[in-house]
């Protein structure tokens, strides 16, 4: 990126105001949506072009929506991606609605990454994590012989960094992701590591 483009992006991040205008009456919390962020950022673009795209990614036997936000001046560009997993069953929603809701969540968080918005402690973040990682109670506790979640994540990250066989990478990912059941932060980071490595392998293919 040129210094001028970097300065424009930094200026947007500094002045962007995206208040939490949405309210979840069931959970009784406020949150910001993808649309709230877009409404706040559009007046600040001033000639820059912002686009968001979705991609359905199959990891193991589950589908994820990968959203990528890109801002460009025509010569320089900067992108950020985020992924969210589709629920197998979502009460009161058909398949299209599930995909749409998952897309909105992924889009919100790729915009967060692009513009430096921290929603890590938002209630809707925790709610989505709980929906994604729901498992029987007996599976949420590690047995005494199970490795610590930090060790599992570290080992997977080191393995993923050097593995070039996509099939083996997916098998290892599925195994380690299951080991991290009940540890939301480590599971999320595991997914992020997997997503980054898959993108790297696509680029060299």
From Swiss-Prot:
Residues 124-150 are annotated as: Disordered. It holds the Pfam family ERF. Residues 131-145 have a biased composition (Polar residues). GO terms for molecular function: DNA binding. Keywords: DNA-binding, Early protein. To phage H-19B erf. Promotes homologous recombination. Essential for P22 growth in a recA, but not a wild-type, host. This is Essential recombination function protein.
């Amino acid at each position: 990126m040129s210094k001028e483009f970097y300065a424009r992006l930094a200026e947007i991040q500094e002045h962007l105001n995206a208040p939490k205008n949405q309210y979840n009456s069931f959970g009784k919390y406020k949150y910001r949506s993808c649309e709230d962020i877009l409404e706040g950022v559009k007046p600040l673009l001033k000639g820059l072009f912002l686009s968001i795209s979705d991609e359905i990614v199959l990891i193991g036997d589950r589908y994820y929506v990968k959203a990528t936000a890109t801002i460009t001046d025509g010569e320089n560009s900067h992108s950020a991606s985020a992924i969210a997993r589709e629920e197998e069953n979502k009460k009161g929603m058909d398949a299209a609605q599930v995909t749409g809701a998952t897309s909105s969540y992924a889009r919100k968080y790729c915009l967060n990454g692009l513009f430096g918005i921290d929603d890590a402690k938002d209630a809707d973040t925790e709610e989505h994590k709980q929906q994604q990682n729901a498992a029987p109670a007996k599976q949420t506790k590690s047995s005494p012989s199970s490795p610590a979640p930090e060790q599992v994540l570290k080992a997977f990250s080191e393995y993923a960094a050097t593995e070039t066989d996509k099939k083996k990478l997916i098998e290892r990912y599925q195994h380690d992701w299951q080991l991290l059941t009940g540890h939301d932060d480590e599971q999320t980071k595991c997914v992020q590591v997997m997503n980054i490595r898959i993108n790297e392998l696509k680029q060299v293919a």
